[in-house]
């Protein structure tokens, strides 16, 4: 299913993993979405002109995330069938190209965005910081987190001027590993398998005493309300979740 959500600075776009058959079947739709992505996010004639295929060094593309946006940083997919549609196993989790490759083409970038962990690459027009199995929360420990990818970008920032960075597109796809690991690792389920059957889970308290202070000036006496918003969401959702667990696990009771 294809979906697009946007505001004045961010755009969320849902596109399935590109395969050779899918590309042949939905070529026009993917092209349309790619053009929409660039035109709706940027109202800049330089970028619009670049869509005509003209190489324009004023814009670049940077990608972060997991295997969907891994430009070849996880070095074990250099064999068939990866890259089979181009006869070019390039380390990407696809049969040839991934979504950022098509977006780069729409933006007039002549070469595919290179993986940063590959030596001697040209990052003039951007770079791929995404790594397969990456997660937000960092579990398992062997995976790279989004924060670590951003740190890598920070360490390389001197390669680009601020104006170029401001004009460039930053694409992020991450979260699959976090959801997968959450469904595989459930401490309560483990306790239940060890014969525990009665659970009391206390709701989170409102952070009335937490004071948000500027990290540089150490000033500020206002409560940081975004934390309380998260607490409220947590407390609203945990009850129905526990009820579902009780229904699917006979003999388990819980109170919250």
Swiss-Prot record:
Membrane-spanning ranges: none
Keyword NADP: no
GO cellular-component term (any): extracellular region
Main location: secreted
Cited InterPro entries: GDSL, GDSL_Est/Lipase, SGNH_hydro_sf
Record carries keyword Hydrolase: yes
Protein name, as recorded: GDSL esterase/lipase At1g18120
């Amino acid at each position: 299913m294809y979906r697009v959500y946007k505001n004045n600075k961010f755009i969320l776009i849902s596109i399935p993993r590109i395969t050779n058959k899918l590309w042949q079947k939905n070529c026009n739709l993917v092209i349309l979405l790619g053009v929409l992505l660039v035109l709706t996010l940027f109202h800049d004639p330089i970028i619009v002109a670049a869509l005509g295929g003209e190489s324009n060094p004023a814009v670049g593309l940077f990608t972060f995330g997991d295997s969907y946006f891994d430009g070849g940083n996880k070095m074990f997919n250099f064999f068939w069938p990866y890259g089979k549609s181009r006869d070019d196993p390039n380390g990407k989790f696809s049969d040839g190209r991934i979504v950022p490759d098509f977006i780069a083409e729409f933006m007039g970038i002549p070469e595919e965005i290179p993986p940063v962990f590959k030596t001697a690459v040209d990052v003039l027009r951007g770079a791929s910081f995404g790594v397969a199995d990456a997660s937000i929360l960092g579990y398992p420990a062997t995976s790279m987190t989004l924060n670590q990818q951003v740190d890598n970008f920070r360490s390389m920032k001197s390669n680009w001027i601020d104006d170029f960075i401001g004009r460039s597109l930053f694409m992020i796809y991450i979260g699959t590993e976090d959801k997968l690991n959450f469904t595989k690792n459930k401490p309560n389920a483990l306790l239940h398998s060890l014969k525990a059957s009665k659970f009391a889970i206390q709701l989170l308290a409102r952070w009335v005493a937490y004071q948000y202070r500027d990290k540089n000036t150490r000033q500020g006496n206002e409560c940081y309300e975004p934390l309380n918003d998260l607490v409220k969401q947590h407390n609203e959702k945990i009850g129905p979740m526990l009820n579902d667990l009780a229904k699917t696990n006979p003999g388990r009771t819980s109170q919250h």
